Curated annotation (Swiss-Prot):
This is 3-phosphoshikimate 1-carboxyvinyltransferase. Disulfide bonds: none annotated. The active site is at D314. Belongs to the EPSP synthase family. The keyword Amino-acid biosynthesis applies. CDD domains: EPSP_synthase. Keywords: Amino-acid biosynthesis, Aromatic amino acid biosynthesis, Cytoplasm, Transferase. It comes from Shewanella amazonensis (strain ATCC BAA-1098 / SB2B). It is an enzyme of class 2 (transferase). It catalyses: 3-phosphoshikimate + phosphoenolpyruvate = 5-O-(1-carboxyvinyl)-3-phosphoshikimate + phosphate.
């Protein structure tokens, strides 16, 4: 197993241009495919998850070109659903942002499609989405366990109608439904049951759908109405914002490390909800400065907070490790959906924080962290989860440093993360 030892770092300083957002990249690729016209995506994320989406689209006959650095993609839209008389098997790794939207989109046209993934993907629920698609007339069957991939779709189109979906588990299910609804044969009304998690991710979806010319009536995130007869039309060019979740590690480093870190590519005007991570850091005592397309974090004495993190579920993980450098206890609540991500992030985070000496209380949907007087060096298991690896890089600010097991798992969203981190760090 590969390991990376991060030696103690006293402070950080510098500027980081954040790679494109994973959430926006994969949504935009799918909408560009369904749209009429040619779309150029600029600042596309080059990572495993995006590669899985691109490979699937290529297999399905979608034509696109990539720049040498794979951050600019020009794609010729199909002007509607994918229509084929062939059977396809598509391997989607552990990319939820490819599995869920593709599962929905492939029901719109014709063909037989089998969607598979890594073993962890077979543990990530998709049943709520499949149930909703079946309400609209989709023919989908599970190949192993009910409610989980792999699955096979026999596509004949979606009829339209009223559909209910549980919003309390993952916003990706609602995102997938919203993106396909305009291309159903009839009008679609989506009623959301339960409290909608990760609401800002729905804002990303609605923003992109509007850019591609589709109208959605949003009734307070509890009911969405999508008229029939709509079509996606390419806006020509889509600029992908920097990934706000990826920005969180560098902002936390600035807050902990006593220097100044500026992240560019994401700022006050960002559509991503995870930019509000900077507000959580400010609540801990960090000095935060906002620009339209940048955020600056400066070091300060941090203190624990008690906060509902439902609105920033991915970036909230970074608060868990930043809490090791804060005075007092930090409690984060309303984060049950950590449990159905790349790994059970609540259990994994609790386990690894205890290794470095923290006192941790893990609940059904919360975590409470009391930092040790002095963290101890530990080998951190990353569970093939990119965010675990990046979060625990912050332990480099402890006198003991840290060892990250399987650091290459950051390839899911940020392949050169540790190089970027090292460029900011000033060793002791």
């Amino acid at each position: 197993m590969d390991q990376l030892r991060l030696e103690p770092v006293s402070r950080v300083n510098g500027v980081v241009n954040i790679p494109g957002s994973k959430s926006i990249s994969n949504r935009a690729l799918l909408l560009a495919t369904l749209a009429s016209g040619e779309t150029t995506l600029v600042n596309l994320l080059d990572s495993d998850d995006i590669r899985h989406m691109l490979n699937a689209l290529k297999s399905l006959g979608v034509n696109f070109t990539l720049s040498d650095d794979k951050t600019v993609c020009t794609l010729n839209g199909l002007g509607g659903p994918i229509q084929t008389d062939k059977a396809f098997e598509l391997f989607l790794g552990n990319a939820g942002t490819a599995m869920r939207p593709l599962c929905a989109a492939l029901t719109l046209g014709t063909g037989e499609f089998t969607l598979t993934g890594e073993p962890r993907m077979e543990e990530r629920p998709i049943g709520d989405l499949v149930d909703a698609l079946r309400q609209l007339g989709a023919d989908i069957r599970y190949l192993k366990n009910d409610g989980f991939p792999p699955l096979t779709i026999n596509a004949t189109g979606l009829a339209g109608g009223v559909v209910e979906i549980d919003g309390s588990l993952s916003s990706q299910f609602l995102t997938a439904l919203l993106m396909v609804a305009p291309l159903a044969k009839g009008a679609v009304t989506i009623a959301v049951k339960g409290e909608l998690v990760s609401k800002p991710y729905i804002d990303i979806t609605l923003d992109l759908m509007a850019k591609f010319g589709v109208t959605v009536v949003n009734d307070n995130y509890q009911r969405f109405e999508i008229a029939s007869g709509q079509h996606y039309v390419s806006p020509g060019k889509v600029l992908v914002e920097g990934d706000a979740s990826s920005a969180s590690y560098f902002l936390a480093a600035g807050a902990i490390g006593g220097g100044e870190v500026k992240v560019t590519g994401v700022g006050r005007l960002a559509v991503q909800g995870d930019v509000k991570f900077a507000d959580a850091l400010a609540a801990m005592g960090a000095d935060i400065e906002w620009g339209e397309d940048y955020i600056i974090a400066r070091g300060s004495k941090l203190h624990g907070i008690d906060m509902d993190m439902n609105h920033i579920p991915d970036a909230a993980m970074t608060i868990a490790t930043a809490a090791l450098f804060a005075e007092g206890t930090t409690r984060m609540s309303n984060i049950y959906n950590w449990r159905i991500k790349e790994t059970d992030r609540l259990a994994a985070m609790a386990t690894e924080l205890r290794k470095v000496g923290a006192k941790v209380e893990e609940g059904h949907d919360y975590i409470q962290i009391t930092p040790p007087v002095k963290p101890v060096h530990a080998e951190i298991d990353t569970y093939n989860d990119h965010r675990m690896a990046m979060c625990f890089s912050l332990l480099a600010f402890a006198d003991c440093g840290v060892t990250i097991n399987d650091p290459g798992c950051t390839s899911k969203t940020f392949p050169d993360y540790f190089n970027r981190f090292a460029n900011l760090a000033k060793p002791d």
